[in-house]
């Protein structure tokens, strides 16, 4: 649904992007994941990506974080809490897996819309503040251009200027830069394994949150 990505589509976009990494970068990502999941082995998947999670996933891979970010959490730290500490997030993952199956099973527009609406109802039952997050602000959308002939540099500056309305480009930039900072902190000398793991986990959370909004930028219904 290119008008607005749903959880399984966010997850699929993340999955495809990571599957296309070079072998060296994929190995590096796997190594980061292994360090970050220390202590959370029962909740987080053994591999950073799970291509076929089935209809009832019992663990969350990194690709799923892009679906959870933004729609089922309000910040990277909130997302981490939901991913690692809540029971309902696994219900959400199962609903998303069923939605992915339902969307793949038909090209009929009405049936696809019904599948999405049914999943929204089920998401709301599992995640009680699901609809509240969606209606809180316009953060998932692109900032409207001041003028039709606004050039790219002026537009991006407007998106990132202090006081600008919340917007997808601003959110992506903020959390991507934060992820880079935290990844850098994880490599500082003198850190214990627990401290390094915490920095890497936080960096992965920030990047997944950033990626959710990067994906939203390319949803047709999110363009002002």
Predicted features by range, described:
Residues 3-201, 205, 223-224:
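N-terminal, motif-rich segments that launch catalysis or mediate targeting to/interaction with membranes
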